[in-house]
């Protein structure tokens, strides 16, 4: 299968060390034995910190996005280094480059591409562009909920949810840089039109990404 894996920056950079990068590299190498892999990495805390500084300078949200994108590419480079020789030794800046790099048979790791696109959106667009069979979104919680589980104890997780229902849930969310709490509208629209199987899992345990390929786990988004 051709698989796109999106990994939130907060997953890889909960602590400023190499452990999570190495843990993910180990699992991804295992998956790569049987599948073709593309990876999209988010910005996490470093991106939020830099964006906060830029926003305090009075810059536009587009500039904030630009800074965030640069951070995602640094994070992507760190994961690419952890993967060593199984990964392509450069970070693509657009989807065409990602597809071209994949022709080498190497794992392709990338960060953001366009302003106002979350990691989820980039992963979904990449999946459509390269004709992926599966998207696995590694987040900081067990799946998708009807509201933020970090704020509400009564939040209910979906084992399966339609793209239309998801759109209702996120319709009131804003799109400020670095503030994506669920999965953004662009990602949902791409999932709906492309009909690519998408699974949301808890990425704090890297093994969950491998499990999602063959077993029910987290939240399955349906068209």
Swiss-Prot record:
Any one annotated GO CC term: cytoplasm
Pathway(s) this gene product operates in, as recorded in its UniProt entry: Pyrimidine metabolism; CTP biosynthesis via de novo pathway; UDP from UMP (UMPK route): step 1/1
MF-aspect GO terms: ATP binding; UMP kinase activity
GO terms classed as biological process: 'de novo' CTP biosynthetic process; UDP biosynthetic process
InterPro entries (UniProt xref): AceGlu_kinase-like_sf, Asp/Glu/Uridylate_kinase, Uridylate_kinase, Uridylate_kinase_arch/spir
Activity control note: Inhibited by UTP.
Annotated ATP binding sites: 9-10, 44, 48, 139, 145, 148
EC code(s) of this entry: 2.7.4.22
Cellular localisation: Cytoplasm
Reaction equations catalysed: UMP + ATP = UDP + ADP
Summary of subunit composition and partner proteins: Homohexamer.
Similarity section: Belongs to the UMP kinase family.
Protein name: Uridylate kinase
Species this chain originates from: Methanosphaera stadtmanae (strain ATCC 43021 / DSM 3091 / JCM 11832 / MCB-3)
């Amino acid at each position: 299968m051709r698989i796109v894996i999106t990994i939130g920056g907060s997953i890889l950079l909960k602590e400023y060390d190499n452990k999570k990068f190495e843990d993910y590299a180990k699992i991804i190498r295992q998956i790569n034995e049987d599948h073709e892999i593309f990876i999209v990495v988010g910005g996490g805390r470093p991106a939020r910190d830099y964006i906060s500084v830029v926003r305090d300078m009075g810059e536009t949200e587009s500039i904030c996005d630009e800074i965030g994108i640069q951070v995602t590419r640094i994070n992507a480079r760190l994961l690419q280094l952890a993967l060593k020789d199984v990964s392509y030794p450069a970070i693509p800046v657009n989807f065409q480059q990602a597809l071209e790099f994949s022709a080498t048979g190497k794992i392709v790791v990338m960060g953001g591409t366009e302003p106002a696109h979350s990691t989820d959106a980039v992963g979904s667009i990449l999946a459509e562009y390269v004709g992926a069979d599966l998207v696995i979104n590694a987040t900081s919680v067990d799946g998708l909920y009807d509201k933020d589980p970090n704020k509400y104890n009564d939040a209910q997780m979906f084992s399966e949810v339609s793209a239309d229902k998801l759109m209702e849930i996120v319709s009131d969310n804003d799109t400020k840089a670095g503030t994506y709490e669920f999965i953004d509208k662009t990602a949902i629209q791409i999932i709906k039109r492309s009909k690519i199987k998408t699974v949301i899992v808890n990425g704090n345990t890297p093994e969950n990404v491998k499990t999602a390929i063959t077993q029910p786990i987290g939240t399955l988004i349906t068209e």
